[in-house]
């Protein structure tokens, strides 16, 4: 005799109850996951359980750089778009830009005090220091690269090329052997009045070099859509530049490029160093500011994708992604600082973050 399934009201009720329970369980799991992602960093936040789950090892080569008993810390918040962190080893402070607010801020290592260091600041973006301890800044608003002298006056290092104004210098590094300044000019600062003064680009986006002795400005390459973050390898034989051209060019890659440095002043042919595509995400984000450590790894700010992606991506010298530092905001730039240059400072949209790592910055920041 064939048995037919029961269709009485009790069975239906049990089935509905089970479905309701499973649905509720699923929602609870999603809520828990969302809560886990929505990490609190404010003064009243509970301390994170070690090891910090947002310092992620993707490859065993990153294990030695992750410290088990240190947290990612938010040092300050309240900016509109934080950028350009740079460490001053003599003054023991970090300077960074808040571009839309036209200000440079300073964080003191001794007590964590934050103050406005310079305002107006030319809508400055990237900052660094030369080997004489003088601050170099890339100004969106004035479309130039400047140096702040010890006496307080400002020296304009570059504001035009071949008779045309620069677009909006973005980030810069200083070469130790000859003091030359290498910088990127993607033009983001003139696209809107929000971060500078709106205007048309008169030059192709490019990477430049300023000769420290003569002041001569040389174009190194324009074989890149929108050159952004920039850094040298530890031996100064290679130059890395982040390409964020996909923000405005449909056929632009989302990657970091590398060039061999020829005769100390020129670049060979560029090639892809690392892709910003990450397994498990439908789209790739952007690398922005980048810095190298003494082992040749490249630490790249990353963002514009969302939770689990935004933060810092760490690439080994062969271009393989080996680790992540996840942040609750888009990360715009990074630098190494602190007494041992083993503290990674990260500007994350509206906030400043820091974390100790078992790596040391390769250069003056």
Predicted regions and their residues:
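A short loop-to-beta-strand structural motif that recurs across blades of beta-propeller domains
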Residues: 103-105, 144-146, 206-208, 255-257, ...
């Amino acid at each position: 005799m064939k048995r037919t399934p029961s269709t009485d009201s009790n069975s239906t009720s049990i089935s509905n109850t089970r479905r309701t329970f499973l649905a509720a369980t699923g929602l609870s799991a999603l809520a828990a996951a969302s809560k886990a992602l929505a990490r609190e960093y404010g003064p009243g936040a509970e301390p994170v359980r070690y090891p910090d789950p947002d310092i992620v090892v993707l490859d065993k080569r990153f294990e030695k750089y992750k410290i088990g008993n240190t947290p990612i810390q938010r040092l300050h918040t309240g900016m509109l778009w934080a950028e350009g962190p740079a460490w001053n080893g003599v003054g023991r402070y970090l300077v960074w830009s808040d571009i839309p607010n036209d200000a440079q801020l300073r964080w003191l290592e001794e007590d964590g005090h934050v103050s406005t260091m310079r305002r107006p600041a030319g809508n400055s973006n990237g900052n660094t220091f030369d080997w004489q301890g003088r601050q170099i800044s890339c100004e969106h608003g004035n479309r130039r690269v400047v140096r702040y002298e010890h006496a307080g006056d400002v020296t304009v290092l570059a504001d035009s090329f071949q008779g045309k104004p620069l677009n909006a210098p973005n980030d810069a590094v200083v070469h130790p052997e000859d003091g030359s300044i290498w910088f990127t000019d993607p033009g983001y600062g003139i696209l809107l009045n929000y971060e500078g003064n709106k205007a048309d680009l008169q030059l192709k986006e490019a990477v430049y070099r300023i000769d420290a002795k003569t002041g001569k400005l040389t174009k190194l390459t324009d074989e890149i859509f929108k050159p952004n973050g920039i850094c040298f390898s530890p031996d100064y034989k290679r130059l890395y530049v982040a390409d964020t051209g996909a923000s405005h060019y449909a056929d632009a890659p989302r990657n970091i490029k590398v060039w061999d440095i020829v005769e100390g002043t020129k670049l060979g042919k560029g090639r892809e160093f690392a892709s910003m595509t990450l397994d498990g995400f439908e789209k790739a984000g952007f690398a922005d500011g980048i810095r190298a450590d003494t082992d040749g790894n490249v630490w790249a700010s990353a963002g514009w994708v969302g939770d689990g992606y935004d933060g810092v991506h760490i690439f080994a010298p062969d271009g393989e992604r080996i680790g992540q530092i996840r942040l609750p905001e888009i990360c715009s730039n990074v630098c190494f600082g602190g007494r041992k240059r083993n503290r990674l400072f990260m500007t994350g949209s509206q906030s400043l973050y820091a974390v100790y790592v078992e790596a040391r910055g390769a250069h003056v920041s």
